[in-house]
Design a protein with these regions (language model features):
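Mobile cap/lid helix-loop segments that gate and shape the active-site cleft of serine hydrolases
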Residues: 680, 735-736, 741-779
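Conserved alpha/beta-hydrolase "acid-adjacent" motif
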Residues: 791-799
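Short beta-strand/loop motif that positions the catalytic acidic residue
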Residues: 777, 783-785, 789
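Beta-propeller folds
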Residues: 1-501, 505-510, 516-517, 845
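Non-catalytic accessory segments flanking enzyme active sites
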Residues: 32, 54, 107-108, 119, ...
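Cap/lid segment of the alpha/beta-hydrolase catalytic domain
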Residues: 571-710, 714-722, 729, 744, ...
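C-terminal catalytic histidine-bearing segment of alpha/beta-hydrolase fold enzymes
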Residues: 411, 798, 805-845
């Protein structure tokens, strides 16, 4: 018993440092899985150990005989001597910040349709893995105008890699690379500029191999420091729409859609390093609420190839839609055999359109021997001409037609994976069904997903079904109506559980994950990869599954000789991540008249506070729109357990606006985030005594009583806003708070997020700000903010601090030099926990 107690206490003591060193216990865990080909193979990323941040590319294989294996395809340290140095382009750093990517090495990859070739970058250098050959080679890009290499995407046919430099869209012909280029040699003629940023309000420039490439390079070079970008997602798309791509291959590899945007109308913001007064501030464009967005354009590029399949030239067409009314390009989807789909939104996100883009006929390149010539090496150069089809008015490539329109009085949600065509041409879209209070899917305009299954994400669309992540609303879909596989744990399949299900177009559905938790899936052919975790496992799980056919002539369990059988092979992918060394002591409950989903984390059984009669309460919410923290996933409560073992009853309550409970619940905060989200946290506090008494009665185990005279709140981002708000506007309930990166003034946040909830009326922003509340402060408040935060600028905390100073209100401010919206420094992350602990201990005496 003594040894166990010491071990538990050691784990709690070591948690802050261990969490920081392991990137929140993610190092060594497999991630980013994708089933490929017939499903017998699956790609994934994983680093070598629990404190190794450098991720490698791996493949899981299930053989026809059911044997399984994990194969290392690409190790950054083998491919690059300086792989640990983490020298990536600034644009890539920005993309990773948008995606909250903290790893290094190979952090993303692109695979062709057959699952044979994989493209990726390491420290800004381009690489290609040929899976069948078992070879990974570097593609050296030496010419300055062809760099940096950003967002490489391999063509579906595996013959080309397209990437962007931000100024140019660049094609790499892999036939030329494979034949002529070794890893250390410049790719040379294999690399071509296919399009550049526009110049002087001209159309996008496509390379036509007739001398205009030089003009494109010359014009674009003049604007390299300008405001136009090509092939990249603008800030609002990456930060708020979860759209990180800025160009898209057609399934037949004959077209590319690419984005260009002009950020010159956006506000110019500056990120400074106050610790180094000699270092100039970095200027960047930011889509500040109630100001102009980037001007986003889309271009359809028809690609021409020579007889060797190498890029020869192209024809660019502007994609036309009502950009003045629908300025947000929210999603792009392209299904084989069909036109590409766009989802565009208006400024307030109350109206959207699903558009089909006409692509026309693929261009034909014809040999033009009369234009042939001999190059300086004496080699004959074959030349080609491009045949340009004629189209009737309104049918030209780049024209669009409206397939569906949607509207909502508050806002329309973006559901990842929609819109999409089924292979046979039916249109699948998302629907906020207010009458059914369910986020649903439609096929050709008709809802088909069940009432009470809140669709969170679409993972795959076939002619037979849609694979999606859902959350059940028990009030709308009772346990008696659930499939057999969920009957034994029906009470846990609710808003806390992100479940993968298959839903057919007649409304029938079946669960593909049975254990409540946070799950996702990738499928291909007869195989799939399931990734996620529940409450029982400290480590995330990844399982590669494949239906394997028995060989002809097998006999088993009375099955006749020669009959075909299918058996499921499940291959767990190894996880090398660290674990905290303790299991959170979590009790789920519902709080208050609104039945808020809540997690109560009590001191561990071995803690010195386990048998305390009464303990202070620490509210630890996010509490804002679009994100939940009460989830059936153990990792959500590790921080909370550390706090509980410092002597607190820790409570996380998901109030109105958090996802998973239907569109009406989400929209209860519309134009009134501040008051509604605080009210729910106050209600949670006062509902806590009865909830704890009920827990004690049900379990037969005594639990500490909550000391409602000593209630504190901590949080980050929206949780930071809520924490500061708690002590400003509800000091009778909350005795102290630590507010990390709080958006104190919503006019300083971005357009797409903020205007969705607050609209465009300045009075609404003033009502939801907490700057004017500064004179009310009568409780201890700690503000924490990173100077390098390009998401929630430190100006938010500085303005609140200035207002507090002007009002003569004592407070603590921890400005963090070099820290972004992620606390990505080991020492800082560790010490932040300890400093907050000590601050609250003093404040609650």
């Amino acid at each position: 018993m003594v040894g166990r107690l010491e071990g538990m206490n050691d784990a709690i003591d070591e948690f802050p440092g261990l969490k920081a060193r392991t990137l929140r216990f993610t190092c060594g865990a497999p991630r980013s899985a994708r089933a490929i080909g017939d499903g017998s193979r699956a790609l994934f990323l994983r680093s070598d150990g629990p404190e190794d941040t450098v991720t490698s590319l791996w493949m899981s294989v299930i053989g026809s005989d059911g044997d399984t294996d994990e194969i290392l395809l690409a190790d950054p340290r083998t491919l690059l001597a300086d792989a640990d140095a983490e020298d990536v382009p600034a644009e890539e750093k920005a993309r990773r910040e948008r995606a909250r990517e903290g790893g290094s090495g190979i952090v993303g990859y692109s695979v062709d349709a057959a699952g044979n070739r994989v493209a990726f970058t390491i420290n800004g250098q381009l690489f290609l893995t040929d899976i069948a050959a078992g070879v990974t080679r570097g593609i050296a890009i030496d010419e300055p105008e062809f760099k940096p290499v950003l967002n490489p995407r391999i063509s579906p046919d595996g013959r080309h890699i397209m990437y962007t430099t931000g100024t140019y869209l660049v094609d790499v012909d892999l036939a030329d690379v494979s034949d002529t280029t070794d890893a250390a040699e410049d790719a040379g003629d294999a690399v071509s500029i296919v399009a550049s940023v526009p110049q002087d309000d001209a159309d996008d420039v496509a390379d036509t191999q007739d001398g205009t490439q030089d003009d494109a390079q010359s014009d674009a070079a003049e604007s390299q420091a300008g405001e136009w970008k090509i092939g990249l997602a603008e800030f609002a798309a990456g930060e708020e729409m979860d759209r990180y791509d800025g160009f898209w291959w057609s399934p037949d590899s004959k077209y590319v859609l690419f984005e260009t945007f002009d950020a010159s109308h956006e506000q110019t913001w500056y990120i400074a390093d106050p610790a180094d007064p000699t270092k100039p501030a970095q200027a960047r464009r930011y889509p500040q609420a109630m100001t102009a967005n980037a001007d986003v354009h889309l271009t359809l590029l028809e690609l021409g190839y020579d007889t060797d399949g190498c890029y020869y030239g192209g024809i660019a067409h502007n994609v036309e839609w009502d950009r003045e009314s629908y300025e947000y390009l929210a999603a792009v989807s392209w299904t084989e055999g069909h036109e590409p789909l766009l989802l565009v939104q208006d400024r307030l996100q109350q109206h959207d359109q699903v558009l089909a883009v006409h692509v026309g006929e693929p261009i034909v390149t014809m040999s033009a021997p009369e234009n042939g010539f001999t190059d300086e090496d004496g080699s004959e150069v074959e030349t080609f001409s491009i045949a340009i089809p004629e189209y009737a008015p309104g049918e030209e490539p780049g024209t669009t037609r409206v397939l569906e329109e949607h509207s909502n009085d508050c806002w329309l949600d973006l559901i990842a994976g929609t819109p999409a065509y089924t292979p046979d041409g039916r249109l699948v879209c998302a629907m906020n069904d207010m009458d059914a209070d369910t986020n649903r899917l439609t096929v050709d305009g008709t809802p088909f997903t069940p009432k009470g299954l809140q669709v969170r994400e679409v993972l795959d669309v076939t002619d037979n079904d849609v694979l999606c992540v859902v959350q059940r609303t028990p009030e709308l879909l009772p346990a008696a109506d659930l499939p057999f596989l969920w009957q034994s744990n029906a009470d846990d399949h609710d808003a806390r559980s992100f479940d993968v299900v298959s839903i057919r177009y007649d409304g029938d559905w079946e669960p593909l994950t049975c254990t409540p938790g946070q799950w996702t899936m990738s499928r291909s052919g007869d195989g799939c990869v399931v990734t996620g975790r529940g409450m029982d496992d400290a480590r995330s799980q990844m399982q590669h599954c494949m239906n394997v056919r028995t060989t002809e002539g097998d006999v088993a369990d009375g099955v006749a000789d020669g009959a075909e059988m299918m058996s499921m092979v499940v291959s767990p992918i190894e996880n090398h991540s660290e674990i905290p060394g303790f299991t959170p002591n979590v009790r789920f409950t519902r709080l208050g008249e609104r039945g808020l989903y809540a997690a109560v984390i009590l001191p561990s059984a071995d803690s010195a506070y386990a048998h305390a009669d009464q303990l202070p309460v620490l509210m630890k919410p996010y509490g804002g729109p679009g994100f939940q923290q009460v989830v059936e996933s153990q990792s959500f409560y590790w921080d909370a357990q550390w706090w509980a073992d410092q002597g607190y009853i820790v409570v996380t309550a998901d109030g109105r606006g958090t996802t998973g409970r239907g569109p009406k619940w989400d929209r209860a905060i519309y134009e009134n985030m501040k008051a509604v989200t605080l009210e729910d946290q106050v209600d949670a506090v006062y509902a806590l005594p009865d909830a704890l008494a009920s827990i004690a009665t049900k379990t037969g185990v005594a639990v500490p009583k909550p000391d409602l005279g000593r209630v504190a709140m901590i949080g980050w981002s929206y949780g930071g806003f809520l924490s500061a708000l708690a002590v400003l506007d509800a000091p009778d309930t909350f005795a102290a708070a630590c507010a990390g990166a709080p958006p104190t003034d919503w006019t300083l946040y971005d357009t797409h997020y903020t205007e969705r909830y607050l609209g465009l009326d300045p009075d609404t922003y003033e009502r939801n700000s907490i700057i004017a509340d500064a004179p009310k402060l009568s409780r201890p408040l700690m503000l924490i903010h990173g100077f390098a935060d390009d998401n929630v600028t430190i100006a938010n905390s500085l303005r609140l601090s200035q207002a507090l100073m002007a009002a003569g209100r004592k407070h603590t401010f921890l400005p963090l030099n070099g820290i972004t919206h992620m606390t990505n420094d080991e020492t800082v992350a560790r010490n932040l926990l300890l400093l907050q602990r000590d601050f609250l201990a003093d404040a609650l005496v």
